[in-house]
Each structure stands twice: as structure tokens, then as C-alpha cells.
Amino acid sequence: MKKYLLLFLALNVVSFSMELTLDEAINLGKKNNRQLKEKDINVKQKKLNENAKLKNALPSVRAQTTYVDHDESKNVNSSFQNGVYLSQPIFRGGDIYYNAKSSKVLREFEEDDYISQEIELKLKIIESYITCLQLKRTLSVYEASRNEKLEELKKQTEFYKLNLIDKSEVLRIETSLYQTETSILKIKNNITSQKLILKNILGLNIDENIDLKEMEFSKFNVQNIDLKKDTEKAIKNSTLSKKLDKNILISEYNSKSNRSNFLPKIDLEYGYESLEDSSFSKSNNDWEWRVGVTFKWDIFNFGSGMDSYKESTLEIEKQKIYKIDSLETLKREIKTSYLDLITAKETILTNEKALATALETFNIDKEKFSNRIIDSVDFLKSESQLREAQITHINSQLDYFLYYQQYLSLLK
């Protein structure tokens, strides 16, 4: 009964595991990732800030009441004055205009930054997903190796009982089997750890069971890649390029806004207020409309305004230099990524040949070992070479896909 209960629980655990393809994992990450949610909030905040800056150019209305309470010994009544006022900026030297333009570009920059983080998130998910698959396939190789050694250990144990071989042959295979068991345990632990990393990226609970589906690699030919064309396109239209341009534009608007401090500020105020102070001891219903113009000009402030303006103009130059440096780095990264992709493709072809050779060698050596032509040392060496060739081939296939995704991410 206990065995059936354990089997039922095990089946439930499997049935409640979340199966994910790579595309599903990417979509889930975009939906749940906490860092991406924070960035989305930043975009909304910048939009609200843009609205606030635009509204600074609109008139504002305020109600104002002034109350004065005098000392009774002076025989003066307490008084108050009421008014409703409408204020409208007329001229601010371009401060309101450039702040509004700057806030718009800041919002667009934040949107581009959201896209950048989305691209980075997708690449992180792919890298983590690929690592899990590499470990999963590596585990299959080691489990096949363990089964091979278990089968061989049984044969050699029978041979030893028949006094056909000495005990050292059995011990070598047994030792190798223990080492394989240890490797399997390490790989399983690594898979668990890597899945924890992936679940964190996807915004899943760490106790959530996930099962990653194998990937069908689409055939893509690196010969179809036009490196020069891709690089030129990335320099002009990539998200990074757009962000760099916006940084310069923001600096220019900030500089023009600082320059407005040298110009006068003119505001129009239109009010409806009581003619004079009204007393609590008498009734006064006389109100009138009043209009006024406020003119303000900071003539001298020991050059602090000029220093701020010069600082802002230097910021423009700094951002232009930063753009040149960043785009040069981007070109170098695209070139390097392309070369990695070419190398990875050739590596796959080489590893395929190496795997075929290792497999054929192992089959020959296995036959020799069965016929006692070679000893367990040579057999285990051949088996180890086959295992390493299988793992290397697995990794090269997945690395090729990963390099291709890294190349594409640099162009976006």
C-alpha cells in the first residue's frame, strides 16, 4: 500500500510540472520578470512627468485669503482680503518649452531602455535555458555510460568467478562506475541550481516544478549574413544608437533651458479680488477685476548661472564622445560575435567527425575487450573519449544557437 501511495505522489509531482518550450519561457519571462515590471513603471512615470511639464505652459488658478488679527489695545479691527487669481506664463526664455521637449525625449529614452532590457532578458532566458538543456543532455550521456559500465561489470564479475581474469579488471570498472555515479549526482545538482536561476528570471516561485522541452534547431546559414550591412543598420537604427542620440538631445535641451536663466521672466496675472481690506465688523461686497504683469530678471548672481550653462554645454560634448565610443564598441562586439558564430559552425562539423571516430573506436575496443585482446584500462579510456566527444558535440550545437541569438541581439 505504501509503495502505491508513493507512486501516486510521484505521478502527481510529474503531472503538476510546468512544461515549457523556449518561446513559452521567453513570453513568461516578459510577463513576470520583476525588473521588467519596474522598468514599465519607469516608463509610466516619465509619461506623467512629460504631461506635467507640458501643463506648466497652461494657466493656473488659485484662491487666496489673507487674514490679519490686530492687538485689541490698538483699537484696530481684524481684517481679511479675498481674491481669485489666474496666472499665465508669457515669456520664460524658452525654459518651459525646452523642459517639455526634454521630458518627451526622456520618456522616449525610457521606452527604448525598456526595449533594451527586454532584449537582455530574452538573451538571459535563452542562455539559462540552453545551459539547462546542455546539462540535461550531458546527464543522459553519463546515465548511458553508467548503464554500459553496469552491464560490463556484470560480465567481468562472471569472468572473475570463472578465474578468466584477475580482480584488478573488475575493480577498475567498479571504480570508474563510482566516478560516473558521482558525476551524475553533480550534474543533477547543477540542473537543479540552474533551474532555480531560470525560475528567478522567469518570475516563478522557486518551488515551482518546470520541465524544459527539447529544442528543434532551425537551420540558418551564416553565409547569408551580411556583416557590413548588419553593422551599418545597427549603428543607425539599433536601440543602443537611438538611446545615444536621445542622450545628446536631452543634453542639448537642458543646455538651452539653462540658457533661459539669462533672460527675463514675464507672467500675466488676472484676478478678481476685494477692493480693500474687509473687516468682520462691517459688510463690504465691493469686488473688482484686476490685471497685472510680473517682470523678473536676474541681473547678477556672481556668475553661477553662467557656470551652470557652461557645465551643460560640456555635457553635450561628453555625450557625443560617449556615443562615438559606444558605437565603436558595438561594431567590435558585432564583429566578434560574428566570428564566434563562424567558429561555432566549423566546430560543430569538427565535433561531428570526432564523435563518429570516437564511436567507431569504442565499438572496436568494446569488441576487443570482450575477446580479451585489450584490458579494462584501454576499454575505459575509449569509453571516456566517446563520452567526452558526445558532450562536446552537444555543447557545440547549443553554443552555435546561443551565438546566433547573441549576434541578433546586438542588431536590435
Region spans (language model):
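Alpha-helical hairpins and coiled-coil heptad-repeat segments
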Residues: 153-170, 361-380
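Periplasmic alpha-helical coiled-coil/stalk elements that build and connect Gram-negative outer-membrane
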Residues: 17, 118-233, 337-340, 344, ...
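Membrane-embedded beta-strand positions in outer-membrane beta-barrel channels/transporters
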Residues: 83-85, 129, 290-294, 338
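Transmembrane beta-barrel architecture of outer-membrane proteins
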Residues: 79-81, 127, 172, 288-290
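Sec-dependent N-terminal signal peptides
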Residues: 4-13
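Small/polar (Gly/Ser/Thr/Ala-rich) solvent-exposed segments
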Residues: 37, 60-77, 87-116, 242, ...
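Bacterial Sec-pathway N-terminal export signals of envelope proteins
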Residues: 16-62, 166, 206-249, 299, ...
